[in-house]
Amino acid sequence: MFLRISGRVRLNSHSLNAQGGGGTNYVEITKAKVSIKNDDRWEILEVPAISGNMVKHWHFVSFVDFFRETDYKDNLTERALRYNGARFGQETKAKKADGSEVELKDESEIIKNFADADVHGFLAPKTGVRRVSLVKTSFILPTEDFIKEVDERLVYAVKHNRVDIDEKGAIKSGEEQTAQMLFNREYATGLYGFEIILDLGFVGVPQSSPSNPVIEDDERKARIVSALKALIPMLSGYIGANLARSFPVFKLEEMIAVVSEKPIPALVHGFYEDYVEVSKNVVENAKKLGFEIEDFGYNVDFGESVSSVEELISKIIEKL
């Protein structure tokens, strides 16, 4: 099963991806440069961004949470229980969630024993074994039409303070004590586009020597379902840092999705103002070439209408 999703979310007062700030009292939000065409003139602009690495991490977190609810919960790396991705170092063996060890010599054995390495990929540099992630995420960026229409700065700073108290609950004072620690943190607001690709048809299938899946059908389905369900928290706001003190004022504005039993073209990123129309052309022409595709849309004229991310995922799971 192969799924492609693009769409747009409204994010107000978010600080989902920060950089720098070490040793300073100023925490800067991550930024990226984008190309925008105004009439016949191209511009390169710096905008706030949420990196694909951050988005992928939060899919990984939710995947682990959902997979731990299945009968195959021990088939995870021990690192996954701490939400660390399958980035092996110089070791030649890795521990499973149940404490047993697996040799990192063969891709088939690794993905058989580690669902997180199967779905999210891995690299074992000591043995030279690797696997490309089946989950691919783009940067989340302010949309080009939003950038053109809004003159306000997309990034702003808010001053915070931490109050230091003693064991009696009183605010500390004195030369060597800090009553208040002031710091500034950047936040951003805007309409953002995203794109996610899930190549779940390759779950359990070695990439080094493609063959039949090396895991049983029931576990394979459990891995696929967990990867699909992991999209639900992501598309409700669980996609970045600083969630405890500034959970994003998040709303999914629109979304398009296509699913097939075989690999299919990617949709156009939600960054582009014409992403729905161009994606529709991609799907229609792909169908003419023989691709069997089911298409879905939320708040847009695109394929079968769905009322939420949850309904989309439910419809896809029903087809497994």
Curated annotation (Swiss-Prot):
Give the record's keywords alphabetically: Antiviral defense
What PANTHER family does this protein's entry cite? CRISPR-ASSOCIATED PROTEIN CAS7_CST2_DEVR, PTHR37459
| Protein name (record) | CRISPR-associated protein Cas7/Cst2/DevR
User: Taxonomically, which superkingdom?
Assistant: Archaea
Keyword Heme found: no
Instruction: Please give the function described in this protein's UniProt entry.
Output: CRISPR (clustered regularly interspaced short palindromic repeat) is an adaptive immune system that provides protection against mobile genetic elements (viruses, transposable elements and conjugative plasmids). CRISPR clusters contain spacers, sequences complementary to antecedent mobile elements, and target invading nucleic acids. CRISPR clusters are transcribed and processed into CRISPR RNA (crRNA).
Biological processes annotated in GO: defense response to virus
Query: Which Pfam families does UniProt cross-reference here?
Result: DevR
UniProt keyword Chaperone present = no
Family recorded in the similarity comment: Belongs to the CRISPR-associated protein Cas7/Cst2/DevR family. Subtype I-a/Apern subfamily.
Q: Which InterPro entries match?
A: Cas7/Cst2/DevR_sub_I-a/Apern, CRISPR-assoc_Cas7/Cst2/DevR, CRISPR-Cas7/Cst2/DevR
